[in-house]
Structures are given as structure tokens and as C-alpha cells.
């Protein structure tokens, strides 16, 4: 067998690009550097859902209650003094080495009964006002239960006592 050779030039299909690596690392612009700040560990405690937000207004609470009712869940108010509101060694019966925030054998006192017949947010606001008037130095949270699954679905703080020193405004939460 004989092979014929020709003088053809071979052109590559694609040229390779040189990779240029930056000489330094950056997180972007200087305005994004706030995301890299240090969390303030003192007097900066949170309760469940929405705790990272400023205190909820009555309108915001009403919208949350409307969402709860649209899902056929039952709202309920609970309250606790500042000595019982957070998990500590003194107020928690531990079954093991650790404690979470809900299943820790530390229960808040229920305000009246769950609001089975509740039809709008104004009824819950009336009960929050009554509970705040009766216990002005207590933390008050709104929880909701799903009767079908028999579990607590959500819980969030609706009243923080005036004397509370454990809350920081969002702008003051980082160093």
C-alpha cells in the first residue's frame, strides 16, 4: 500500500484562551462588606420565627393570622416571664445533654384556650391586648396548631416587655 502525501497546512478548529487569574480576592464592592461583619453575641436573643425582624405591627400580625386561618390552623397565645422565656439550666427538664427551643420540656403558659372559632385577625389582636394588659412584663407569642397533623406549625413573638434588654435593633446586631 502506498500513501500519498500532500503539503497541506493544518488549522486548529478553535484557539485556546489564556486564563487570567486575578492577583487578589474580593467579595465585590465595598458596600457588600457589611455582610461580613461579626455577630454581636451579647443581649441579642431571638424567639422562633420573625425574631430577626423589628417588632411586628398590628397590621403585620393581622396578616399572619389571616394566613394561619386560610390554612385551617388554630391560633393560640402563650406567655412567659423573662425568667422562663429562654432555655436555661434552671427552667428546663432535660432528657439528654442538649435542649432545643421547642421540644425541651419548657412550656409557656397558655392564655385562655386555643382560638378554635377565630375568624379574623382582630380577634387575636384583642386577646393580645388583654394578655399584655394582664401581664405587661411577660413575653407573648402567637403559635398555631394543625389539628390534622397534630403539631405546632409556627410560633412568633407578638409582645416583648418594655423592660426587656435582650433585643437589639437590626442595625445594632453586628460589630
Swiss-Prot record:
Q: Which InterPro entries match?
A: RuBisCO_ssu, RuBisCO_ssu_dom, RuBisCO_ssu_sf
Q: Does the keyword Transcription regulation apply?
A: no
Q: List GO molecular-function terms, semicolon-separated.
A: ribulose-bisphosphate carboxylase activity
**Compartments reported by the entry:** Plastid, Chloroplast
**Transit peptide: first to last position:** 1-34
User: Where does the protein principally reside?
Assistant: plastid
Q: What superkingdom heads the lineage?
A: Eukaryota
Gene Ontology, cellular component aspect:
chloroplast
Give GO terms for biological process.
photorespiration; reductive pentose-phosphate cycle
Q: Which UniProt keywords apply?
A: Calvin cycle, Carbon dioxide fixation, Chloroplast, Photorespiration, Photosynthesis, Plastid, Transit peptide
What is the documented function of this protein?
Answer: RuBisCO catalyzes two reactions: the carboxylation of D-ribulose 1,5-bisphosphate, the primary event in carbon dioxide fixation, as well as the oxidative fragmentation of the pentose substrate. Both reactions occur simultaneously and in competition at the same active site. Although the small subunit is not catalytic it is essential for maximal activity.
Q: Per the similarity annotation, which family is this? A: Belongs to the RuBisCO small chain family.
Mention any additional remark.
The basic functional RuBisCO is composed of a large chain homodimer in a 'head-to-tail' conformation. In form I RuBisCO this homodimer is arranged in a barrel-like tetramer with the small subunits forming a tetrameric 'cap' on each end of the 'barrel'.
Assembly and interaction partners: Heterohexadecamer of 8 large and 8 small subunits.
Protein name from the UniProt record? Ribulose bisphosphate carboxylase small subunit, chloroplastic
The scientific name of the source species is Batophora oerstedii (Green alga)
